[in-house]
């Protein structure tokens, strides 16, 4: 279980959120909401261990993540708002790099899940923004991490792709995994199982 305890985040002397606390357990899908500038990306980076809060701490299974970095890196997958893939490599080469323990068959299957069959050997820099995003999202079919932290994973993805990715989120949660995401897109109607946390300058405003 992930526990955020009394997190405060400030940028350029402006408090983005203060005393923010919540938990994310096995099987949870949590959407972080809020207006632009509320600190959604900053929160995800703090949760992933890429930034430090002004105060507060992150616990994973009741232990501070800073005390178990190696375990945390295995248990957590972070995908930022940029695709985060290597433009000079192909989709196949990217996934081999990020998931060296996976077979080519597994990688081809993952690329098929995100509709990139036929693009395995293309240069990523020559793909569209949506295709580059899907190369990154193919990692969701390969990762063994229990917690996924995803910043705008649905950007440049069409409606059918959104539904498939949300289905993968649900499958991951059904296996006891957890998902934390931000998105500006409306989620499919059937995804009423998604918990929502809304950020304001005072921290968590609403959670349901």
Swiss-Prot record:
Its EC number is 7.6.2.5. Residues 2-206 form the ABC transporter domain. It catalyses: heme b(in) + ATP + H2O = heme b(out) + ADP + phosphate + H(+). It is a peripheral membrane protein. The keyword Repeat does not apply. GO terms for molecular function: ABC-type heme transporter activity; ATP binding; ATP hydrolysis activity. InterPro entries: AAA+_ATPase, ABC_transporter-like_ATP-bd, ABC_transporter-like_CS, ABC_transptr_haem_export_CcmA, P-loop_NTPase. GO terms for cellular component: plasma membrane. It comes from the Bacteria. GO terms for biological process: cytochrome complex assembly. Keywords: ATP-binding, Cell inner membrane, Cell membrane, Cytochrome c-type biogenesis, Membrane, Nucleotide-binding, Translocase, Transport. The complex is composed of two ATP-binding proteins (CcmA) and two transmembrane proteins (CcmB). This is Cytochrome c biogenesis ATP-binding export protein CcmA. It comes from Tatumella citrea. The gene is ccmA.
